[in-house]
Amino acid sequence: MKLLTHYKGKEYYYTDNMLYVKTGDGAQFQKLALFDRHFYKLRVFNKIPILEIDGLRMQLVRDFKTPLDYPKEVVRTLGIKKGESVLDTCTGLGYIAIEAEKCGAKITTCELSPAVLTLAKWNPWSDHLFSSPNIESLQSDIAHLIKGMKDKIFDVIIHDPPRFSHAPDLYSQSFYRELFRVLKGRGRLFHYVGSVGESRGRSLASESSRRLASTGFKDIKENKRLQGVFARK
């Protein structure tokens, strides 16, 4: 077991497959893991915590030095500017929301799972998600929440959902219509789709691109490195 960091009076240690916290002198090591219909845990990749659900990694780390490099590249490619409003549909550990906020943007981010938010609150690298006045963190189902949002209120949408088999509704054309509706004119979208199915000849990026196009999105471009699709309203 190795020491990762000290943060706010707590000590964080890690092994190859688990992150632990020690809350004070004489305290026992506590696994940062819990079960809520699925098994959620934090582990470490290149000195940065990542989230796993049922053994599936939720951060894209392939071709990136650390889990923080992927959100940096997404935000940089979107060209997020000071004062813009950003919707982050699936919070996770909040790394994308935090990176977008660094640009001076106002962020609304939504997470379905209370378990994920509980682990994020234990994660020192997620602390800014809950402490920044420029990030509104909501625990809700974005598929329902978005229906109550006003038209044309976001400059940028970052849609980084779980894989298709876990949340097919977040890849549906009806949901894409809601994304289109709440996005301002000429607003930008990034939609992570992953690489599942490619070995069988299926391309979720191509399928999603066609649905986005039929919804009205333009300038649709697949990005293999980020395993997603960029588009504009």
Describe every region a protein language model picked out.
Residues 1-44:
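N-terminal auxiliary segments of SAM/dcSAM-dependent transferases
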Residues 65-83:
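Conserved alpha-helix/loop element of class I SAM-dependent methyltransferases that forms part
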Residues 81-92, 108:
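Conserved class I S-adenosyl-L-methionine
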Residues 93-105:
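Conserved SAM-binding loop of SAM-dependent methyltransferases across substrates and taxa
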Residues 110-150:
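S-adenosyl-L-methionine
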Residues 171-185:
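A short glycine-rich, Lys/Arg-flanked "PGG" loop and its adjoining helix->strand segment in the class I
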Residues 186-194:
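Conserved beta-strand signature within the Rossmann-like core of class I S-adenosyl-L-methionine
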Residues 196-233:
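Class I S-adenosyl-L-methionine
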